[in-house]
């Protein structure tokens, strides 16, 4: 999922908490800002097979 909100890539080492911005760079330290939205799923999810099977059973 693509989000307009970005977070400072180095916030764990340079800031007390996450620093959010809409620009490409961090307003406090000038570092790179990255997409703050997590991936919607993990392709290597070990439980994905069971989750999909449960979803399929609920459709019937």
Swiss-Prot record:
Q: Which GO terms describe its biological process?
A: pseudouridine synthesis; rRNA processing
| UniProt protein name | Ribosome biogenesis protein Nop10
Offer an example of a GO molecular function term for this protein: snoRNA binding
Alphabetized Pfam families for the sequence: Nop10p (PF04135)
Cross-referenced NCBIfam families: PRK13130.1 (NF009623)
Which residue ranges traverse the bilayer? none
Basic residues: bias regions: 49-60
- State its role: Involved in ribosome biogenesis; more specifically in 18S rRNA pseudouridylation and in cleavage of pre-rRNA.
The GO cellular component terms are:
ribonucleoprotein complex
For this UniProt record, give its keywords in alphabetical order, as a comma-separated list: Ribonucleoprotein, Ribosome biogenesis, rRNA processing
User: Family assignment?
Assistant: Belongs to the NOP10 family.
Which source organism does the UniProt entry give? Halobacterium salinarum (strain ATCC 700922 / JCM 11081 / NRC-1) (Halobacterium halobium)
- Which Cys pairs are S-S linked? none
Q: Which gene encodes it?
A: nop10
Disordered as annotated region, ranges: 37-60
């Amino acid at each position: 999922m693509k989000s307009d909100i970005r977070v400072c890539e180095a916030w764990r080492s340079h800031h007390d908490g996450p620093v959010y911005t809409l620009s490409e760079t961090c307003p406090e330290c000038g570092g790179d800002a990255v997409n703050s939205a997590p991936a919607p799923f993990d392709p290597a999810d070990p439980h994905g097979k069971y989750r999909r099977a449960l979803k399929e059973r609920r459709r019937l």
